[in-house]
Amino acid sequence: MSELSESGSYNSYNSLSAGSPLPLQEIFNGAETKCQSHYLQSRINTNYEQVKQQLKESAEKKNSSKIYSSLQHLTYYKVEKDLLETILRIIDITDDKKTLRLAYYFLGEISQFKHLINNSTEIKNITTIFNKEMQHKDISRKVVSLKTTASVAPNDVLIDANILDVISGILRKVGEDPDKTQKKKGFFTRATTDLGRERSLLQYSCFVACRNRYKNNPSLFMPIVEGIKCVDPVGARHAVSLTLNYALENPSTVAATTKRFIPLLKANKGKEAVYLVDPFARRNFIKLCGHLAATPSPIGNVITMENKDFFQSLCQSVMDAHLSVAFYAINVLSRFSWPTLESAHIDAIQFDSELPHFESLAFQTSLIVGICNKMRIGFNTYSIGAYSNYSMQHGHHHLHHYHQGGSGTVGGSVPSSSSSSSSSSNITTSALSSGSSSNSSLSSQQLLLVQQQQQQLLHQQSNPFLHLACKLISVLSQSYVKYSYPKDSTTQQPIIGDWSFDEKQYQHQSVYPYHHNLSPFTGLPNPISNNNNSSNNTKDQSTTTTTSTTSSSSNSIHPFSSLTQLILNLLNISPSISIRIQALKALVWLCPSNLDQSKLYLETFRSQLRDPYHPTHLFKELFLELYKRIIATPILSPMILELVYDWIDIIPSKCDTSLVCEIWKTIVEFGKVFANEKLLASIFKILDRIVHPDFRVLAMEIQKDIIKFLGEYSNQITFEQPSRFEQCKSRSGSNQQQHLSNMSLNSIIQRLQQYSIFSPWQIRLESIDSLAKIAFQSSTVVKVHIYNFLTLLPNESHGWTTVKSNTSIIVNTLDQLLTCRAKWLPLFKSSDLSQNQIKDLKNDHTNLCLQIGLFFDQLSFDYLPLGIESKKYLGSK
C-alpha cells in the first residue's frame, strides 16, 4: 500500500496502512481526524485538512460538482464542529438532492458537538436555515430539516420556541387550527390524498424531533398521544414510544387517555381502536400496556379495574400473527406473578379486516394454553431449519444412512415436536427413499434436489427465536415452580421435603465402614426406610408433617410439560451452543418437583455430560441453573448430587469445583440431618471413585478442593459444637469413647488422617489444614484427638518440610488453646472472676482469635475459643 504524497502528509501522523502498523496509543490519539478507510487512503492524495479546505472553497464559489465530490471524500473522515458554517451554507445554496442528503448527514454528525455550539452567530444561522427549510415546497426537505435541527441545535430559548411552534402547528388537532386549513376528520388517520400523505410524513418528523429533544414536554402531551393513530407506520412507532415516556412519569393520566386506543377491547368496538401496521409499533404499544398494567395500585401489586384492560390487551397480543410481537407480549407477561397468569384468559377473536394482524380464536381460552400453542407454532416454524442445519453438517453420514434404507432422523428417532416439523423434515426423506427404492444409488439430480430443499429449510432457522423461546419457557416455568412448591407455614421458605426415595440406592453401600447398622449422626440403629411415619429423632417434625403436601404438589402436572419434547429435540438437532444452554436451562425448570418423575431429566443431563464437544461454560451454566433450582425446590437435591458426581467423574477437566462447593453449601444450610447424610455420602463416593491415570492431576486438584470444603463445613454437616463435652481431665484421651456419639465426624476425621499420611504432599498439606479447622470448631475431646494425631504424624516423605512447618504451627496453636482452656475452665465454674482475671481472659481470647483466624477466610465474630462459659465475661469487650 502506497504512502500519502508529501503534499498530503498527515503532519505528525503516519499512515494507517496494514503494512506499517502504529502504536496503539498513537492510533487512538489520531482517531478524531484520521481517515477511516485504508482503501481510500491508498487511492487518494488528500487528507482531512485538505478535504475540509476544498469543501469550504467550493461552497464559497458555489461549485456544485466540487461540493458534491468533496462531501463524498469527507464521508471517510470523522467531521468536527468547525464544519458547521460550511454545511449550513451548502444547505442554503443548493437544491441538488444528492448533495443535500450528504449535507444533512454531516449536520447530524456534528450534533455530537452541540454542547460546544454557543456562538450567537452559529445559533442565528441554524435558526435562519431551519425557518427557510420549513417554508420550502419540497416536503422531504421539511422532514429532514426538522429531524436534524432538533438534534444539532443547542439548548437555546429562541431555538426551542421556534421548533416547538413548528411542531405544534403540524400536530395541531382539528378545530384548533386558527386558519381553518384542516377541517377533515381523521387528522392523523386519513392519508388518501397527496396532502394527507405529506401531513403524515411531517407528523413522523415531529415525533422523531420530539424523541430527540422534547420527550416529556407537557404542551405536546395530547398531540403525541393522539399521534398513536398516525397513518405513517414509523411515525406511530415514535408516538407510542413518546407516550411510554409520559407514562413513566404520570401513568394514571396516560392510562385514562390511551385506554380508548386498545385493540380488541370490547368497549372500543367500532371506536378509536388503533391499527398499528408496524410490528415495532405494536411491540412498543405492548410495552406501554405492560407498564400501565403493572403500575402498583393502592391495595398492592395486583390487577385492578384501572389496569385490567391493559393487562387483557397483553393477553390478546399473544394471538398476534407476527411471532416476534407475540413473543414480546409473552416476555412482558412473564413479569407478572404466577397467580395472575394462571387466572388470565384470551378472549375469542373474530377476523376483522381492520385488525388483520390478530389470529382468529373461536373460543375463549386460558392464557397459559394460548402461550403453549403459540410456542408450538414458533417451534414448528423455526426449528425445522435447525434440523436442516444439523443434517447439512452431517450430510455424508445421512445420505449413506438414507441410501441403506434408514429412517432419516437425527439420533435414530424422528423429532416429535410437531406434525409440521416431521412433515417438513420428511420432504428430504421421501425424496431420498424414492430414489433408493428405484435405484441402488442416488442420482446426481436427486442429490441436487436434496441440497436445494435443505437450503430452503435452512432459511427458516431462527436462532434468536429459539433462544428467546427457551428463555421464556424457563422464566415462566420458574415462576410456576416457585409459586407452587410448598412453603413452611412460619418462615415461608421452601420446605426440604422427604428424600427417602433413593434410600435403597445407598442401603447396600457402606459409607461408614465400621458401623453398618448405626446411623452416622446418632449412633442408633437405622430406622426402617418404609416406616416414614414412625418416630424418628433424626428428622424434624416439620419435615414429616409436610411430606404429604410435597407429594401432592410434586404430582401436579406442570403447565408447560407439553413443551418438554420440543426442548429435548433441540438438544438433538441444534448445533448452536447458546441454544443448547438455553434449552438445558428450560429443562431444569420443566423438571417435576418429584424425585421419581425426575429420572428422565436426570438421564438427559447425564447424556449432555458425556458429549465431548460441549464447552466448559455450558456445564457451568447448567449447574448454576441447577443450583438455583435446589434453592427453590430442595426436594431435587439428591438428583443434583448425582449429577455433581457425574460431572466430576466423567469430565473432571470441565468441572468447576467452586460452583460444586456452593451447591454443597446450600444443602448444608438446609440444616437437616437426612440432607447432610445424603451430602456426605455423595462426597465420600466422589473421594472413593476410581480415577483414570490420565486425570490424576485434575483429580488431585478436585480432591484438594473437597478436602478444603470438609475442613470448613464438617462441623455444620455433623452438627458438632465446641460446647459439647466441656470437661477435659487430660490430653491422653480419657473421653475417647465419646467419639462414637458422632460417627459422621469420626468418619471424616479418619479419612483426613489417612490423606495426611499416605497422599502426595499437596493433599497432606490440605488435609492437615482441614483437620486444624475441624479441631478449632469442635469440642475439647475432638481437639485432643487431633492434637495427639498431629504430634505423632510421621515425617519421612517427599515434601515433608513444608508440611512439617505447617503442622508445627497448628500443633503450637492447639497446645496454647488447650492450655488456656484447662487454665480457665476451673475458674469459670468456681466463682466470678476479678477485674484483673477478666483482663487476662480478654487478652488470651484476642491472641487465640488472631492465631486461629489465620486458618479461616473469615472467622465468625462470635467465635469463643475458650468455650461458651467465657461469653458473659467478654460481653463488654
UniProtKB/Swiss-Prot annotation:
Low complexity composition-biased segments: 412-437, 529-556
| Positions of the UniProt region annotated as Disordered | 398-437, 522-557
Q: What domain of life is recorded for the organism? A: Eukaryota
- InterPro entries named in the record: ARM-type_fold, TSET_member_tstB
Q: Outline the subunit composition.
A: Component of the TSET complex, a heterohexamer composed of tstA, tstB, tstC, tstD, tstE and tstF, which may act in plasma membrane turnover. tstA, tstB, tstC and tstD are likely to be the core complex members with tstE and tstF acting as associated scaffold proteins.
Instruction: Please give the PANTHER family that the UniProt record associates with this protein.
Output: SH3 DOMAIN-CONTAINING PROTEIN
- Specify the protein name: TSET complex member tstB
Lineage, opening ranks: Eukaryota, Amoebozoa, Evosea, Eumycetozoa, Dictyostelia
Identify the gene encoding this protein. tstB
